[in-house]
């Protein structure tokens, strides 16, 4: 029977080791074997279970409720992400920034960055992106909390093994989304730094020798696609984000 370390499982299942530990310790979802030195070892059944947990979470089930669903073999797929958005919105409206930070941190420990970005943070930010001053203020608070939290996550990830990369926004206007994409990349094994300002004219030769992860927004233009491919054909170490 094949056995895998937590790092190997993280790569196989595309999930942060911190999240795997939280699923085990806090929620009892996983029961890995242990080496004599106390290191976790997972088998193929554990990997299947992790993927099943991810499926439930992607459908909006709170982590605390997944264990019951796993034991019941239920095929129901509820979508609870709207409820999670409302909880986050409540914290924003309460102006209790300490509680808001703690809630975001807990979600970050319980869920993969990609899942949170796709199902929670991006949809709620879209709801807040309007001309109403009150909602604009809430969006500003949320963005500040997110960037601060992500910066801490990236700093922690840089202490681990991985390949260094610089995240760059090319002709974008949503800087917070750039940080979210960098956070997702950091959970895929990259050690990330973020160029804080978007570049309207992107010249990769200015970053010679660096691996560049480029975010062009949700709707990458054909010209951008062709230019990125041309740079890669020239040997530039450039990778598009979010595609």
From Swiss-Prot:
The HTH merR-type domain extends over 3-72
Pfam families registered for this protein in UniProt: MerR_1, MlrA_C, MlrA_helical
- Residue numbers of the DNA-binding region are 6-25
Record GO biological process? regulation of DNA-templated transcription
Has UniProt tagged this entry with the keyword tRNA processing?
no
Q: Name one GO molecular function term.
A: DNA binding
- Keywords in alphabetical order: Activator, DNA-binding, Transcription, Transcription regulation
The family database entries (PROSITE patterns) matched by this protein are listed as: HTH_MERR_1, HTH_MERR_2
Q: Record's superkingdom?
A: Bacteria
PANTHER family cross-referenced by the UniProt entry: HTH-TYPE TRANSCRIPTIONAL REGULATOR MLRA-RELATED, REDOX-CYCLING DRUG-SENSING TRANSCRIPTIONAL ACTIVATOR SOXR
What role is this protein assigned? Transcriptional activator of csgD, which is required for production of the curli (AgF).
Q: What is this protein called?
A: HTH-type transcriptional regulator MlrA
Taxonomic lineage? Bacteria, Pseudomonadati, Pseudomonadota, Gammaproteobacteria, Enterobacterales
């Amino acid at each position: 029977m094949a056995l895998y370390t937590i790092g190997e499982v993280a790569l196989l299942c595309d999930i942060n080791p911190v999240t795997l530990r939280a699923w085990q310790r806090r929620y009892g979802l996983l029961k890995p074997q242990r080496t004599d030195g106390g290191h976790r070892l997972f088998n193929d059944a554990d990997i299947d279970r992790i993927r099943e947990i991810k499926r439930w979470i992607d459908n909006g089930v709170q982590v605390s409720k997944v264990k019951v669903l796993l034991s019941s073999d239920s095929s129901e797929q509820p979508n609870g992400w709207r409820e999670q958005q409302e909880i986050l919105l409540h914290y924003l409206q309460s102006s209790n920034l300490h509680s808001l930070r703690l809630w975001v941190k807990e979600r970050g420990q319980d869920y993969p960055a990609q899942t949170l970005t796709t199902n929670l943070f991006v949809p709620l930010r879209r709801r807040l992106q309007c001309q109403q001053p009150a909602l604009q203020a809430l969006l500003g608070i949320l963005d500040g909390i997110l960037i601060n939290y992500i910066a801490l996550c990236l700093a922690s990830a840089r202490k681990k093994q991985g390949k260094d990369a610089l995240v760059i926004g090319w002709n974008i206007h949503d800087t917070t989304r750039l940080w979210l994409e960098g956070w997702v990349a950091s959970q895929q094994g990259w050690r990330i730094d973020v160029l804080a300002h978007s570049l309207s004219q992107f010249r990769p030769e200015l970053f010679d020798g660096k691996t560049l992860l480029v975010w062009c927004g949700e709707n990458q233009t054909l010209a951008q696609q062709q230019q990125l491919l041309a740079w890669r054909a020239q040997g530039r170490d450039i990778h598009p984000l979010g595609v």
